[in-house]
């Protein structure tokens, strides 16, 4: 999109990582989201949900924190790659809880979820819209969400604020973008 001709017909999806995070993580981007791209409209923004395999012994955030403190580096979290909302949410949780976990990046969020469901990683922060089908099918157990208020989609799942981590608040977002001009 950044290199496309601004013809009024070329549009794409922009989200959290390539539009807001990558510029600070990677010094040699071939585009500048501030000068090469025009935002058109915000389509959605929503919290992430911390999920574990249903056979996991972890049922609460406190369970995870206790296990991580007992064995630093003994728990893993998957993500859809470096610098995205999956990873940054987990890193924010680690920082605020004073724990250390191992990041296992995948080429996509769905690959990270698949390995979580297979029991190969401990947990993942995922967008609610992509985790919900697996939560409803009892293939994932939700632990907490990253919004200020509980979600009507998961009314029995606490927020990180409720369980003592008010700074673990993350909203992922996506919108339509076009080339500048």
Q: What does each model-found stretch correspond to?
A:
Residues 1-2, 25, 90, 116-117, ...:
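Hydrophobic residues within well-ordered alpha-helices
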Residues 3-9, 24-111, 160-162, 170-181:
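Hinge/capping helix and adjacent helix->loop/strand transition within the periplasmic-binding protein
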Residues 8-14, 122-126, 142-144:
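Paired acidic/hydrophobic, glycine-rich loop segments that form the ligand-binding mouth/hinge
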Residues 9, 72-73, 116, 121, ...:
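Short, high-confidence coil segments that cap the C-terminus of an alpha-helix
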Residues 14, 80, 105-107, 127-128, ...:
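Active-site-proximal beta-strand/loop segments in catalytic clefts of secreted hydrolases
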Residues 15-16, 54, 127-129, 147-148, ...:
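Short secondary-structure boundary segments
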Residues 45, 131-181:
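C-terminal lobe and pocket-closing loops
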Residues 112-113, 131:
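Short, hydrophobic alpha-helical packing/hinge segments within bilobed ligand-binding/sensory domains
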């Amino acid at each position: 999109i950044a290199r496309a001709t601004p013809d009024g017909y070329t549009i794409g999806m922009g989200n959290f990582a390539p539009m807001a995070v990558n510029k600070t993580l990677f010094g040699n981007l071939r585009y500048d989201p501030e000068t090469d791209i025009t935002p058109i409209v915000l389509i959605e923004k929503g919290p992430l949900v911390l999920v574990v395999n249903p056979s996991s012994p972890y049922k609460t955030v406190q369970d995870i924190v206790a296990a991580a403190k007992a064995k630093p580096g003994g728990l893993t979290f998957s993500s859809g790659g470096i610098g995205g909302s999956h990873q940054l949410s987990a890193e924010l949780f680690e920082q605020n809880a004073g724990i250390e976990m191992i990041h296992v990046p995948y080429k996509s969020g769905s690959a990270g979820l698949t390995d979580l469901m297979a029991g190969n990683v401990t947990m993942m922060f995922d967008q609610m819209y992509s985790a919900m089908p697996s939560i409803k099918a009892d293939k994932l157990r939700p632990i907490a969400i990253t919004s200020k208020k509980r979600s009507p989609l998961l009314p029995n799942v606490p927020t990180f604020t409720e369980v003592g981590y008010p700074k673990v608040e993350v909203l992922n977002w996506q919108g339509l973008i076009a080339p500048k001009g």
